[in-house]
Amino acid sequence: MPVLVSNLQGKVAVDEALTGLLTRAAQEVLKAEGYGEEAEVSLVFVDDAYIHGLNRQYRGVDAPTDVLSFAMQEGEPLAGGEEELILGDVVISLQAAERQAGEYGHSLQREAAYLAVHGVLHLLGYDHQGEEERKIMRRKEEEVLGRLNLTR
């Protein structure tokens, strides 16, 4: 289950422990949802200005956000080579993660892992527009975070 990590920002320190945790978080979601070793996602770390531009361009929202998911194809993953299943990209503003961690009283690691889990679930088609969808998605997020020992 390859998880490709790119750090396109320099405002929040990124070390191997953080990238390792977020890689495991993404892999835990994929395992929980029945994906095999061929499933691949990318995690891209950016700052608020970068994600603001993406949010404006792709969602028509002129404000920064914490996480955006870009599925390779809406509704279904894109098959890569014979042994690849490329699901898409999860773009995380580490500036937002750091700020929200302070607001919620937990670590950057916990907040960034939550955003990674949330983003990968979006890649897999989960949403939180309605109350029932929100409950399902929240339960799945908490299950994965619990397996990583990252509870509130």
UniProtKB/Swiss-Prot annotation:
Cofactors (names): Zn(2+)
Compartment list: Cytoplasm
Cofactor binding: number and manner: Binds 1 zinc ion.
Protein name: Endoribonuclease YbeY
GO molecular function, one term: RNA endonuclease activity
Presence of keyword Metal-binding: yes
Gene3D superfamilies per UniProt: Metalloproteases ('zincins'), catalytic domain
GO biological process: rRNA processing
Pfam families xrefs: YbeY (PF02130)
Organism, scientific name: Pelotomaculum thermopropionicum (strain DSM 13744 / JCM 10971 / SI)
Keyword terms: Cytoplasm, Endonuclease, Hydrolase, Metal-binding, Nuclease, Ribosome biogenesis, rRNA processing, Zinc
Free-text function comment from the UniProt entry: Single strand-specific metallo-endoribonuclease involved in late-stage 70S ribosome quality control and in maturation of the 3' terminus of the 16S rRNA.
Broad class of the protein's primary localization: cytoplasm
Gene Ontology CC, one term: cytoplasm
UniProt family annotation: Belongs to the endoribonuclease YbeY family.
Superkingdom assignment: Bacteria
Enzyme Commission code(s) on record: 3.1.-.-
Keyword Repeat attached: no
InterPro entries in the cross-refs: MetalPrtase_cat_dom_sf_prd, YbeY, YbeY_CS
Binding locations of Zn(2+): H118, H122, H128
